Amino acid sequence: MTTEHHTQAGALQLRSVTKIYDAKQGQHRAVDSINLDIEAGKFVTFLGPSGCGKTTTLRMIAGFEDVTEGEITLDGQSLVSVPPEKRPMSMVFQSYALFPHLTVKDNVGFGLDYQKLPAAEREQRIADGLALMGIEQYAHRYPHQLSGGQQQRVALARALVMEPKIILFDEPLSNLDARLRLRMRSEIRALQQRLGLTAIFVTHDQSEALTMSDMIVVMSAGTIEQVGEPREIYHRPVNRFVASFMGTASFVAGTVSEVRGDRYLVATPLGDLDTAGVPGLGVGDHVELVVRAENTAVGLDAPGNEQAGEGSDVVLEATVRSAAFDGSINTYVLDTEAGTLEGRSHGMNELHAAGEKVTCVISRESLWVIPADSSEK
């Protein structure tokens, strides 16, 4: 179970993968013709709301769901007709799926019984797995005698002793408390990097996706909305759905008045603004500015600014609709000439009350333009 002896990570390809369920109202496309390449050794997260198809896609990769149409290949070899137990993959489930009547050691070694390994190798793999997860001292305990975090580590050890090419995670942190979730996501990411595993992680938690992933696949209604590195997904969303799902965003309507290479001059209620945006927009296109709450400084956090113009930050007056203290930050919903915006200030600053007039400054460089008709599902 050392880095040197772990099975080589696998590269996965999905081509026009579709899953159709029969329902009383007719056929339901849970996953609709998705295409995806996952490089060996990468941590990839399927992110989206409930019912978007992320878990169904994971289960098709694992072999727990049949593929209605399309192809899934691992290192160039088709998996479609390969049963789950023959696929070089391990899955960590949301419920951990530990056997209550088996000790930790026997739970970790359960899958190895089907590999018919020599006894000495089996024992060594179990010992390595327990050591890797730091749970050797719990080897003879039963699951009910463990905390949630300890059970999670047992489930991880059980997956890793199989020496998979790919490890699959089906929302494994959702049953843990907030503090333990933070610790476990750091441990899982560090372990994946140490072993060089290919990992596919399913979650609806944007923070998990942003902090753990090499690549994020944002899904909605059975389709892929956007694939990219975390910073790209967050700062350069392709449409309103992605922008809204990743963090807190407001939207300001505008029209493209000039194309300037890879930037646009956009006429908005905030003035004419030079900003970057989704490629391919043209003069006259109706667009929306994506305005992130953390880039909208309120009150004392609004810096001094020269007279507003297309190249400067945006200064505007607003009326506080609602405000809340959230520890390190104050959060605001604001009524402005450009519509409703959300903003932030430092938690040590005064919390402005509803109805107060405040000054806000929006960082122009943080603005991003998307098509006005981009989907919000």
Name these PLM-found stretches:
Residues L47-P49:
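The feature captures the beta-strand-to-loop junction immediately N-terminal to the Walker
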Residues T55-L58, V154:
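ABC ATPase nucleotide-binding domain helices that frame the ATP-binding cleft
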Residues A62:
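Helix-to-loop junction immediately C-terminal to a conserved catalytic motif
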Residues T68-E71, E121, A221, A253:
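Conserved coupling/switch loops of ABC nucleotide-binding domains, chiefly the family-specific signature
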Residues G70-S78:
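Conserved ABC transporter NBD signature motif
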Residues V82-F241:
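ABC ATPase nucleotide-binding domains
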Residues A249, V259-K377:
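Non-catalytic connector elements of ABC transporters
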